[in-house]
Amino acid sequence: MKKDKLKNYILTAGIHTVAVKSQGAVDDVQSEVEQCITASVHPGRKGSDMSTTSIINPNKLFGDLYSFDECCTAVQTILAGAGIDDYQVIRADMRFDSPDLNHYREFQKLNRYLISALAVAYKVKNAYCSVNLFSQKQLSVAVKNKYFEIENYDKAAESHGKDAAASRFEIRSKFFCEQDLKKEFTEVWKKRFDKALKHLDEVHGAYNDALEDLYHDGLASRSVRFRSMTDFLLQWQDCIFCKKQLIEFLERFPDKIKNPVSYAENFKKRYKIEYFSEKDVRFAVEEILRAARTFFDAKKVQEGVQEGVEYALFDKEPEVVQS
């Protein structure tokens, strides 16, 4: 990827939602916070107590929050308004946003590369992308397993331009060994990304296997899907991430491609396919982690979310949960 383009990969982080589990039913949420929480009551089984899973969006209280301190204040305010004082965090989402309307299209292939590396590294089976029904433009790429989810999506399209974010990269943790969000998103996720970066070659192989199947299926189709190898590669260029991968793909067709290296070089020169190095992917990872650290270390408190002000909404001050 060109350096002048990569430098525009800039993200702002924040907690999107937090899910907590509490005992008993949550059925008396005060009106001041009811738009911030969605509660699902689970009846007890075989003598077990009833429990409630509550999904909290702290940004709906006073607007988007860009520091962990103000996020905690908002979450505690919402919990107090819902009458929840004893709970366990069972899921949390962190968002990485850009307001740039071009950001999603500019970096969707780079983000796809990174997300694919996570899928390969952790052998994730639930991996998919979505497209607009009519334009066929990519809307999202996501992978999900028991422990985590990661998704990059066109936020402008999803919100119809109503959200300040135009592009969103989101990571979700669904299994917590410790109730420590900072550690989860700055340390646990760093280990996941580091592991993913070691599997880029396997990403190439996974895509090449799929592309080979698509090529043979296209040749066998009664309708013409492509007229040549060049046509095919242009159709699927978003699944080819580097010169090495393209050469290895072309080597699978010795009867059609006599000189894969020369073919790959000419294809790049003529059609300007976008390639990435491991350094490019690492740059994206470092920006994601930088944005996360900035969020957790920020001390600025948004106006209207100051300690004391929010508690005035309720008769009883919520207990502060130690991290």
What are these regions (language model features)?
Residues 1-246, 252-253, 276, 280-323:
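Structured, helix-rich domain cores that form ligand/interaction pockets
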Residues 248-251, 256-269, 274:
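Helix-turn-helix DNA-binding segment
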